[in-house]
């Protein structure tokens, strides 16, 4: 299959956000959701937070090999069994790739191929509390170490490298509106899948019944008119 055909069947969704905002969890939740909604697509999650380079963190973009990450995005899913062939509606299914992590919106090349870019927004106090819970802090010494790391490294990293990527988002989901934000996000991905299937199959699916969790059109959500949609 040529590169153009592969690109036509690839949907990239990028989800960024600050430390301990649940970016990885929402990506896995979306993966499970779309596995239940569609059996004709391959779904992959690329979690940048699990791909930090080296043993010593720099607390900046140099912690990530974006060339390698981009190659993983471009990598075509291989159908490995006859069961896979039977399972899919057609032999070469759509690839849905969810790129997530603090730096998911940092690389320009990944942003350019992403059909939807999302930023999970949360205030500093809530991020710190979530981080303490995530690290399962059990002693005053551990708490002191974590707060030192937060003040000396994580907070400056958020301010200098992660927070600025918020401007690249098409959709901003605040922590106070997660359920509504998730509904909008799911329906946006559904629309991207149906549009892609329509292009592949060469027919109009506008009248086709699809899962309706949130209607972009009915709510006058025009991403071409407005650079991003902020739910706060």
Curated annotation (Swiss-Prot):
InterPro entries in alphabetical order: P-loop_NTPase, PRK/URK
Subcellular location: Cytoplasm; Nucleus
Name of this chain's protein: Putative uridine kinase DAS2
Family statement: Belongs to the uridine kinase family.
Pfam families in UniProt: PRK
Organism: Saccharomyces cerevisiae (strain ATCC 204508 / S288c)
PANTHER family: URIDINE KINASE (PTHR10285)
Gene behind the chain: DAS2
EC id: 2.7.1.48
Other facts: Present with 4280 molecules/cell in log phase SD medium.
């Amino acid at each position: 299959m040529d590169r153009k055909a592969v690109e036509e069947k690839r949907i990239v969704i990028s989800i960024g956000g600050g430390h301990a905002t649940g970016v990885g969890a929402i990506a896995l939740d979306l993966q499970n959701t779309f596995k239940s909604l569609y059996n004709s697509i391959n779904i992959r999650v690329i979690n940048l937070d699990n791909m930090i380079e080296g043993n010593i963190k720099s607390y900046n973009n140099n912690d990530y090999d974006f060339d390698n990450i981009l190659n993983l995005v471009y990598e075509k899913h291989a159908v490995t069994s006859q069961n896979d062939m039977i399972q899919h509606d057609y032999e070469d299914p759509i690839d849905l790739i969810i790129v997530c992590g603090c730096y998911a919106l940092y690389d320009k090349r990944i942003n350019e191929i992403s059909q939807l870019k999302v930023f999970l927004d949360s205030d500093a106090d809530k991020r710190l509390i979530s981080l303490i819970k995530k690290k399962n802090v059990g002693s005053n010494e551990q708490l002191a170490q974590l707060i030192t790391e937060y003040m000396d490294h994580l907070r400056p990293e958020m301010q200098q490298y992660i927070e600025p990527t918020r401007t690249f988002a098409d959709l901003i989901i605040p922590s106070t509106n997660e359920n509504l934000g998730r509904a909008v996000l799911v329906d946006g991905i559904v629309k991207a899948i149906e549009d892609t299937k329509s292009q592949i199959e060469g027919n109009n699916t506008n009248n086709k019944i699809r899962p309706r969790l949130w209607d972009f059109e009915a709510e006058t959500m025009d991403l071409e008119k407005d650079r991003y949609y902020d739910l706060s």
